[in-house]
Amino acid sequence: MLSTKRLRVLELYSGIGGMHYALNLANIPADIVCAIDINPQANEIYNLNHGKLAKHMDISTLTAKDFDAFDCKLWTMSPSCQPFTRIGNRKDILDPRSQAFLNILNVLPHVNNLPEYILIENVQGFEESKAAEECRKVLRNCGYNLIEGILSPNQFNIPNSRSRWYGLARLNFKGEWSIDDVFQFSEVAQKEGEVKRIRDYLEIERDWSSYMVLESVLNKWGHQFDIVKPDSSSCCCFTRGYTHLVQGAGSILQMSDHENTHEQFERNRMALQLRYFTAREVARLMGFPESLEWSKSNVTEKCMYRLLGNSINVKVVSYLISLLLEPLNF
């Protein structure tokens, strides 16, 4: 029997609303009771697109009483990744930015209205951290059945590499399940072998002048860029440092039709017409809908790159939500 009851959701580290969009994409009838983030720009974008649901709050100050008052069946969270990134300081639980997540773990055993479902996302590398070890212990002691694993959008025929750790937890669940079960919910299962290309996500006509990579940047850092073409089937992970960092921050696009990129780069790199992806193109690759709006906000495109770099892949998470909530039979 299909469930007709709407799901009460608490969106922690809500950012620009990636989890909200993922719930919509998964066709889950949900009510976001509260979305919480400490970033005012992220909250501005969230509220512009979803109504005034996002609250500027410090998660490290929330108490068991606060969580009980929310009384939500699903908690979603994407804790700060900086303590665990390969280019970060890797201070793990000693990093002040881990305090909010540690507070959730400290408070959870004292919550009376425990959520039946929890979804956690973080960077690859989190799984080896002390924070992850504590997370597993707390969830197990609270009666959760946790599955976890590393997934990337390119496993779902999305031409973007963004490996992330995902943890899905069901309260008092005795059955067998696996993170690999997620593929039955994806389009990959229905469209075996179909590979999308970068061109499917590109804007068609606009003034590219402000997106072109400067000659001085190419001369100094050009060999560190990952250069892709419109017919490429993958591009690198876009991080919060895109457009002002080079290595590991995201790919750039070759607009010329030169076949041998390396040879042409050495001969005349400017002829390749290399440009940055626009924020809209990055948003598309990350699964956000065209309705995602920021032009009516005070958030600049430069800031939008940072917010997207901190966000989730909406499509991948929508599949994970379908897996997590499968027992509800929506």
From Swiss-Prot:
GO biological process, one term: tRNA C5-cytosine methylation
One GO cellular component term: nucleus
Top enzyme category: transferase
Effect after changing C81A: Loss of methyltransferase activity
Domain SAM-dependent MTase C5-type: 7-330
PANTHER family: TRNA (CYTOSINE(38)-C(5))-METHYLTRANSFERASE
Function in brief: Specifically methylates cytosine 38 in the anticodon loop of tRNA(Asp). Can also methylate cytosine 38 in tRNA(Glu), albeit to a lower level, but not tRNA(Lys). Pmt1-dependent tRNA methylation is induced by nitrogen limitation and depends on the nutrient-sensing protein kinase sck2. Does not have DNA-methylation activity.
Official protein name in the record: tRNA (cytosine(38)-C(5))-methyltransferase
Gene transcribed to yield this protein: pmt1
